[in-house]
């Protein structure tokens, strides 16, 4: 059972100062998928982001990295989804995940925002529909909820970054499985992966 995913979104903050911060892990997925498919992402002001398009397994997949700030991501997602008549359940959103360690990434369908401002705004702008797919890229947790804001806007130490990068690479490899064979097979493969 394949999934008709038509849009992959990588949540991020715009600008060079945020490019390597943990909160931008979702964007790294989109950038890596574009690189693997030799596609350039270009600025599209009407979608408030950078976009591209790839074809994989005979399916067109639009790529989007919002260039709004994280807490306004939904404006970008909704603009592109509405223009191309893409339903929430045809969207996969890649985002950083505090509740998973670096080196781990997991696919999920539906659910709440878990305190993630990018997901919160996207759910709100999609009419409170939470049925989109998610790719949760583990970044770890600082251990104290009061330190989360600085943690996500900070850069990971080299070893942690290598683990995050390895999980992003594996997630990109699993995208083909997700699109061709469905969520369960993609989860089975990705969820058994852990970079050390």
Swiss-Prot record:
Per the record, GO CC terms? cytoplasm
Per the record, what are the reactions this protein catalyses? an N-acyl-L-alpha-aminoacyl-tRNA + H2O = an N-acyl-L-amino acid + a tRNA + H(+)
Residues forming the catalytic site = 23
At what residues does the UniProt record annotate the site feature described as Stabilizes the basic form of H active site to accept a proton?
96
GO biological-process terms attached to the record: protein quality control for misfolded or incompletely synthesized proteins; rescue of stalled ribosome
Instruction: Give the primary localization class.
Output: cytoplasm
- For the site labelled Discriminates between blocked and unblocked aminoacyl-tRNA, the residues are 13
Q: How does it assemble?
A: Monomer.
Q: What does this protein do?
A: Hydrolyzes ribosome-free peptidyl-tRNAs (with 1 or more amino acids incorporated), which drop off the ribosome during protein synthesis, or as a result of ribosome stalling.
UniProt-recorded name of the protein: Peptidyl-tRNA hydrolase
The source organism is Photobacterium profundum (strain SS9)
> Upper lineage ranks?
Bacteria, Pseudomonadati, Pseudomonadota, Gammaproteobacteria, Vibrionales
What's the name of its gene?
Answer: pth
């Amino acid at each position: 059972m394949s999934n008709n995913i038509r849009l992959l979104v990588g949540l991020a903050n715009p600008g060079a100062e945020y490019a390597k911060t943990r909160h931008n892990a979702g964007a790294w997925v989109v950038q890596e998928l574009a690189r693997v498919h030799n596609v350039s992402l270009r600025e599209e002001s009407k979608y408030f982001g950078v976009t591209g398009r790839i074809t994989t397994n005979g399916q067109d997949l639009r790529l989007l990295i919002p260039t709004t700030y994280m807490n306004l991501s939904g404006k970008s997602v909704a603009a592109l989804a509405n223009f191309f008549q893409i339903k929430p359940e045809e969207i996969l959103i890649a985002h950083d995940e505090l509740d998973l360690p670096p080196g781990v990434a997991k696919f999920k369908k539906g659910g709440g925002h878990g305190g993630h401002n990018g997901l919160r705004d996207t759910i709100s702008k999609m009419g409170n529909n939470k049925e989109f797919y998610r790719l949760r890229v583990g970044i770890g947790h600082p251990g104290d909820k009061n330190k989360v804001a600085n943690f996500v806007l900070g850069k990971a130490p080299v070893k942690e970054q290598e683990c995050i990068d390895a999980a992003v690479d594996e997630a990109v490899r699993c995208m083909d499985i997700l699109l061709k064979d469905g969520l369960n097979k993609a989860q089975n493969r990705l969820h058994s992966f852990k970079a050390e």
